[in-house]
């Protein structure tokens, strides 16, 4: 009876332990059981010995199971054999053998790792409880005890949900100490799909942050303006440029070269000494003297330079004094223009 309790405990505990595994159902198993003739006819094989003979007959069963791993499963099984009972002296006597089993099976996937194969051989080991009910009242009407199962078989997969199942099984009766043998077949149904090994963890290479490409700031287009003045002073009745003013003329030339679109307006002036006609010519000559220096010495385009003489009409000082007249003998030039620069 101790083995019987162990078998029943396995029957209850294993499905609970695998509550999240794939569920298998074998709604009908058909086979043929061959009773041990040595038990039926031997001299010391148990309490049934020398009594009625159990005849071979049809095996019918059903099983409910769970897949514990992709290659290991557990099944709770009920089956029965109902056959003729000879040697009772009563024609038509029968026996009924019932079993409740808990069986583990391991498929070839344990070794091959070919989880998608169509044919899966397996081995089976388990234990259970049996009960005999006999029509012969001369002997024990009912007998029960513990049994062990060992078998080999194969699942023949039709698709992901259905498989044919064939098996050859030996069942050992611990209490009566005899074997019987069963060849059986059935249809195995998987609810929710077969278990498969977890997908391997793919190590993702760390993403190395790519340093952003330095973006050069967009160039700024700026406009620079040129506003410049030139003053050159002359001796009485002279139009030549004195050496002290030549550096100032050079600065104007440099600005005109830097600003290609710049222009210069050059104005000549005199004091009130002498006749007007003379001073008109002298004032223009002084303006042209500055223009000539820019063109001949610094290659400034003459078209960018305009000249005009004003005689004594625009004095900046009093012509009644020597100092005032010196201030009025002059050239005044304004240089204007602009250029576009990119920074």
Curated annotation (Swiss-Prot):
Quote the protein name from its UniProt record: Outer membrane protein Omp38
Question: What's its job?
Answer: Porin. Binds peptidoglycan.
Report one GO cellular component. Answer: cell outer membrane
UniProt-annotated location(s): Cell outer membrane
Originating organism? Acinetobacter sp. (strain Tol 5)
- Please describe the quaternary structure of this protein: Homotrimer.
What would be an example GO MF term here? porin activity
- Annotated signal sequence is 1-21
- Does the keyword field hold Transmembrane? yes
Question: Mainly localized where?
Answer: membrane
- Matches recorded under Pfam families: OMP_b-brl, OmpA
What region holds the OmpA-like domain?
221-339
- Note the superkingdom of the native organism: Bacteria
User: Per its UniProt record, what CDD domains does this chain match?
Assistant: OmpA_C-like
Give the record's keywords alphabetically.
Cell outer membrane, Ion transport, Membrane, Porin, Signal, Transmembrane, Transmembrane beta strand, Transport
């Amino acid at each position: 009876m101790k083995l019987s309790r162990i078998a029943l405990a396995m029957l209850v505990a294993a499905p609970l332990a695998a509550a999240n595994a794939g569920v298998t159902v074998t709604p009908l198993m058909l086979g043929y059981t061959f009773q041990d003739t040595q038990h039926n006819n031997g001299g010391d094989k148990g309490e049934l010995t020398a009594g009625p003979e159990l005849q071979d007959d049809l095996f019918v069963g059903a099983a409910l199971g769970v897949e514990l791993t992709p290659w290991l499963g557990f099944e709770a099984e009920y089956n029965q054999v109902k056959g003729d009972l000879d040697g009772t002296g009563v024609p038509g006597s029968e026996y009924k053998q019932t079993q409740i089993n808990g069986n583990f099976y391991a498929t070839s996937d344990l070794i091959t790792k070919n989880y998608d194969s169509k044919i899966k051989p397996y081995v089976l080991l388990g234990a259970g409880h049996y009960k005999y009910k006999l029509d012969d009242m001369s002997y024990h009407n009912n007998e029960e005890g513990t049994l062990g199962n060992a078998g080999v078989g194969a699942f023949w997969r039709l698709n992901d949900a259905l498989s044919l199942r064939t098996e050859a099984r030996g069942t050992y009766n611990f209490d009566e100490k005899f074997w019987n043998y069963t060849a059986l077949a059935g249809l195995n149904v998987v609810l929710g799909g077969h278990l498969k090994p977890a997908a391997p963890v793919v190590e993702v290479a760390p993403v190395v942050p790519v340093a952003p490409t330095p973006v050069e700031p967009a160039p700024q287009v700026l406009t620079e303006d040129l506003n410049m003045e030139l003053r050159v002073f002359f001796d009485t009745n002279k139009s030549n440029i004195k050496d002290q003013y030549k550096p100032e003329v050079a600065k104007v030339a440099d600005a005109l070269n830097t600003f290609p679109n710049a222009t210069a307006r050059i104005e000549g002036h005199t004091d009130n000494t002498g006749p007007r006609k003379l001073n008109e010519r002298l004032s223009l000559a002084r303006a042209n003297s500055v223009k000539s220096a820019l063109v001949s010495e610094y290659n400034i385009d003459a078209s960018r330079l305009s000249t005009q003489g004003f005689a004594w009409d625009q004095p900046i000082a009093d012509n009644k004094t020597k100092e005032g007249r010196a201030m009025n003998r002059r050239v005044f030039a304004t240089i204007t223009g602009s250029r576009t620069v990119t920074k």
